[in-house]
Amino acid sequence: MSQITLPAFHMPFQSAGCHPGLAETREAAWEWAAAEGLDLSVPARRKMIRTRPELWISLIFPQATQAHLDLFCQWLFWAFLVDDEFDDGPAGRDPLMCERAIARLVDVFDGAAPNGPMERALAGLRDRTCRGRSPQWNRQFRRDTAAWLWTYYAEAVERAAGQVPSRAEFAKHRRDSVAMQPFLCLHEITAGIDLPDSARSLPAYIALRNAVTDHSGLCNDICSFEKEAALGYEHNAVRLIQRDRGSTLQEAVDEAGIQLARIAERVQRAERELIEEIEAAGIDGPTRTALERCVRDYRGLVRGDFDYHARAERYTRPDLVELDERDSLSRHFAA
């Protein structure tokens, strides 16, 4: 039974719908996992079923081709496996084990020969995704993916040292740890665009990207707080508000809801400022079209992420956390 009542969240963006190929992409994801040898333990399988990666990807990319939807869902399936290994399993409680595992994943992403199912799955996803993309896109995607992976090591070290980040430090950390930025890169694939470095360097585009990512991170923290509290996981914005202010759990959740509304306003402000910067810089042609597409689609992305957290049992059923089976989650990095 939940100990908190979620506040009435402010959500100014309309839903873009859900991809009709959701069931097909779910089937494709599980078939892909089996083909890659990603042998999930019984509790890990139950958790992945509750997580519903196919729902998130279908709400985020409702207009994608089925091939893109399947590929992106397989990325998300793999990312959730990584997340559960390092958040819930022993690999995330041993900094040395964590460092070795993350370094290997980053090396494989950079072209090293893979060993084991998780590394082979990553190499396959990388090849299918990055082939034919521009150098600037590949640089951004590599940066975002590696930065996300290394956040698990940072958290493992802080846990081992008995440290808790400040709220300001955590906000910066969460921008990478929520793993939204790589999916903003994937958005370019399904949108048929490829932003030049000049567009990626626009202050308002950076602000828009950060606001979209920050919204996802805080929404996730609010909706996963009870699950993470049961596991003793401290890297959560709601928990940090509670510690910082000495407030009750409900007061911390309410404050986080207010902050979430402010981030939605940041998204809207960044949209307006990006249009102003496009005009001021004299940007036209395909680059202008691509940036305008980002403005339009990012609204639906924020809304889709928001709707997902209200529907997936990973977040709506904290009572299903299996405390006595945490060690069985880590088969790939704790050997």
UniProtKB/Swiss-Prot annotation:
Mg(2+) 1 binds at D83, D87. Pfam families: Terpene_syn_C_2 (PF19086). Its cofactor is Mg(2+); Mn(2+). Disruption phenotype: Cells lacking this gene do not produce (+)-caryolan-1-ol. Sesquiterpene cyclase that first catalyzes the cyclization of farnesyl diphosphate (FPP) to the bicyclic sesquiterpene (+)-beta-caryophyllene intermediate, and then its conversion to (+)-caryolan-1-ol via a second cyclization and the addition of a water molecule. The Asp-Asp-Xaa-Xaa-Asp/Glu (DDXXD/E) motif is important for the catalytic activity, presumably through binding to Mg(2+). This is (+)-caryolan-1-ol synthase. The lineage of its organism: Bacteria, Bacillati, Actinomycetota, Actinomycetes, Kitasatosporales.
